C-alpha cells in the first residue's frame, strides 16, 4: 500500500523546501558577510546611512542573497567603492544607484538612495513581499500611494499610477514615518 494523501503532501513540501534551501545560504553564513559589507560601506565619507535589508534583516533562516541599502547623494562614488571592496571577487552589475557583486561565495546587492528616501527604501527592500503588498493595499484604501520612494497623498490626482512620485509626499525619510502615515506602529523586521 502507498502513502496517504497527507503523507505524500508532506513529502512533496519537504522536498521543495530542501531544493529551495540548497539555492539559499544559511543566515549564520550570510549575516557576517552582510555586516562586513555594512562596516565597509558605512565607513565611506559619501555614505550618510547604511543598513542591511532583505531576509537577513528579517532574520530569516536562509537567504538568496545579501541586501545592503545606503543613503548617499553620491551614488556613483559609492558604487565604485563597493565594486572595489576587498571582498568582491566578481562584479555582476554596476550602475549609478545599484550594483551586484560576488563576495564570500554569495551575491551581495547594493542599492543607493538619496537620504530623504532612505526610510521608504529600507521598508521596501526589507520586505517581505506579502507585507509590502498588505501595506500598499492599506495605503490605497486611504487615497495614498506607497512605494520605495515614500508615501504620497494621491487624493485628487487624476492618474495615481502615472509615476512613482505622484501626489504630495507625506512620508519616507524614516521607516517609522512610513507606518505612521498608514496609522500603524513600526512593525519590527522579524514580523514582516
Task: Kindly give the residue locations of the regions a language model identified.
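Helical scaffold of the NTase/Pol beta-like nucleotidyltransferase catalytic core
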Residues: 1-51
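Catalytic cores of large soluble enzymes that bind and process phosphate-bearing ligands
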Residues: 3, 7, 22-33, 70-71, ...
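Non-catalytic nucleic-acid-binding/docking modules located in mid-to-C-terminal regions
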Residues: 6-11, 15, 46, 60-61, ...
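Flexible glycine-/small-residue-rich
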Residues: 13-15, 70-72, 112-114
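Active-site nucleotide-donor binding segment shared across nucleotidyl transfer reactions
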Residues: 35-77
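Acidic, metal-coordinating catalytic segment for phosphate/diphosphate chemistry
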Residues: 76, 80-192
